């Protein structure tokens, strides 16, 4: 499976310090993202979720940017903060994107970060 860097990654990776430009392609080997032969991170790591996205459909940059827009919108502490979260919690179709470990706290699961664009657009349009 192919991944793409949707936001420049200049940080420590498993292989050491790296500087991966936006738009760079990576591939998966045994659950790890590989760039120029170097192991970068696990495909289920926070670094992967914040900088890299599944790109097998050619929409990796859009997917990555949408996940980050959703997270940012939900984190915004304004008068509509709770209303946005209530919309997420009340939509049973979104439970497939919630981690199961917590009954009273919403954490996005691996499926959210790999979701189809139409699902991510649905979530974003619901809360924007």
Predicted regions and their residues:
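Acidic, low-complexity, intrinsically disordered interaction modules
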Residues: 15-120
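Short intrinsically disordered terminal tails
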Residues: 1, 125-128
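A short beta-strand micro-motif
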Residues: 3-11
């Amino acid at each position: 499976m192919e991944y793409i860097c949707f936001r420049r990654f200049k940080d420590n990776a498993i292989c050491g310090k790296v500087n991966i430009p936006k738009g760079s392609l990576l591939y998966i080997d045994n659950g790890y993202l590989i760039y120029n032969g170097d192991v970068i991170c696990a495909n289920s790591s926070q670094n992967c979720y914040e900088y890299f996205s599944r790109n097998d459909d050619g929409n990796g940059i859009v997917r990555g940017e949408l996940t980050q827009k959703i997270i940012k919108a939900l984190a915004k502490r304004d008068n509509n903060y709770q209303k946005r979260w209530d919309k997420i919690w009340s939509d049973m179709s979104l439970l497939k994107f919630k981690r199961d470990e917590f009954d009273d706290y919403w954490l996005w699961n691996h499926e959210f970060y790999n979701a189809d664009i139409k699902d991510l657009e649905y979530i974003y349009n619901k809360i924007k």
